[in-house]
Amino acid sequence: MKSETDRADDRLASLAVVLPLAVAGFVVAAGCWTLFAVAGVHLRSELALSDLQFGFLLAMPMAVGAALAVPAGLAAQKFGARRIMLICLAGLAACMVILLTTDTFPGYLVAAGGLGLAGGFYSAGLQFVTGHCESKRLGLVLGVFGAGVTGAGFNYYLVPLFHEAFSWHGVPLAYLIVLVLVLALLVMLTDPEDAEADPTAETSVRVLLHRMQTRRAGQLCGYFGVVAGSF
C-alpha cells in the first residue's frame, strides 16, 4: 500500500499536468465568452444591426454563461467534472463552426448563446482542479485557475490583429484550432478516473434551494455578483 507521502506526491504530480491544461482551457473559454465584445462592432456594420439587436448579441454569452454556472456545477458533481469540461469545449468549438458558416443574425445569436458554455467550463473546472490538490494548496490552485480569465483580455489585442490579417473568419478559425488542440490534450493527458462523479453528492434542485437559503451562501453570491459585475 502507498504511504501518505506517496499519495501526496502522486496528487502533486497529477496537479502539475491537470492545472496547466485546465488553465489553458479556461483562457480559451474566457476568450470565446467575450468574443463579441471585440468583434461585435464589425458584425454590427456587416449585418446592419439595430441597437436592440446589437445589445442582444453582446448580452447572450453573459446571460447564458450565468444561467449555466449552477447547472454545470451540479452536472459536474453528478457526471464528473472532466466530462462536463470536455462537453463545454466541444460546444464552444461547434459555436466557432457556426460563426464560420453563418451570415444571418439568428445564426450569430445562436452562436452567441453557445459561447455561454464558458460559464459551464468555469464551474466544472473549479471542481476538476480542486479534486487534484490538497487543502493546503487550495487557495493557490484556485487563484491560478481563476487567472485564466485573462483570456478575455487577450481578445482585445489578438482579435483585431487576426481580423486585419485574415478578415473576420480568421478569428473563429483560430479559436476553433486552439479549442480542438486543448480538447485533444485534455482527453489524452487526463485520466477519466481522476474526475469521476460523486455518487454521494446531493444534486437535486430541492437541496440546492435549501443551501441557497443560508445567510452565508447569500453573502458569497452577493460578493461574487458585485465583483463579476464590475468586471
Predicted segments — roles?
Residues 2-12, 193-221:
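Juxtamembrane intracellular "pre-TM" segments in multi-pass secondary transporters
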Residues 17-51, 69-72:
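Extracytoplasmic
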Residues 27, 95, 106-120, 225:
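Hydrophobic core of transmembrane alpha-helices in multi-pass small-molecule transporters
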Residues 34, 62-70, 120, 152-154:
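Residue-level signature of mid-helix packing/kink "hotspots" within the transmembrane helices
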Residues 67-105:
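Conserved MFS/SLC helix-loop-helix module at the cytosolic interface between two early adjacent transmembrane helices
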Residues 89, 93-96, 111-112, 176-183:
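A generic transmembrane-helix signature of 12-TM secondary carrier transporters
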Residues 111-148:
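Cytoplasmic helix-loop-helix junction between adjacent transmembrane helices
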Residues 144-190:
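Helix-loop-helix hairpin linking two adjacent transmembrane segments in secondary transporters
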